[in-house]
């Protein structure tokens, strides 16, 4: 069903939002029609990965990624139905094509087989976290320790290739991984600075510290769309540079 000129104008008036007329998003007729016919997008999220994304005690989706989704809604009119769960379940649902996209995800070779990644909105350092008394000098030494990892996490995918004999202790969330180390059930956790700061402050895990940066490049966080959904990907990819330029600093300061 084609879109009439009047309908097109109405959709643009209602949905094509811009902070500044100069920066309005030029969506094609095909993209506008796609939005009209697919207004609600099923998006997968990690329920416990603050400050990037999490579900608060009232059941609301919060965090840096949620701010970007709200802005995509303002720019395009797309609405997001958030399916938040532990990360392993979220990744599995995405692979099974139960979800349209992910809100906040690191690119890996495995994920590139079934996802198209947008422009990154954040780069983060990966760090090695352990109890204060643990003497660990360099990244290569982690092969001698029990390493807490979140199932399905990019860190696990990287480590298993480099150190296939590491003893992994699996956690369903970052919070659980920090607790495993804090309570002595695992020796180290490889995570990132913002998540560590958030949990140490909130959960009072004062016996943990960052030992050093992990032997990884910085991790880029992006949104990712299921392969085969080219129009949705093109819309998100078109909007992200505008949002990043206008709002990135404000969002990062807030979180």
Task: For each feature predicted by the language model, list its residue ranges.
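A ligand-binding cleft/hinge motif common to bilobed small-molecule-binding domains
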Residues: 88-95, 103-114, 158-161, 179-217
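Short beta-strand->loop
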Residues: 33, 115-123, 127, 169, ...
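Hydrophobic/proline-rich hinge and linker segments of small-molecule sensing/allosteric domains
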Residues: 42-47, 115-138, 151, 223-227
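Short glycine-centered helix-capping/turn motifs at secondary-structure transition points
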Residues: 3-6, 59, 94-97, 184, ...
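Extended ligand-binding regions for polar small-molecule ligands
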Residues: 1-29, 66-75, 132-156, 160, ...
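Extracytoplasmic small-molecule ligand-binding "clamshell" domains
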Residues: 7-10, 14, 25-113, 163-179, ...
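Membrane-proximal, cysteine-centered motifs at transmembrane boundaries in secretory-pathway
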Residues: 170, 175-180, 197-198, 220-225
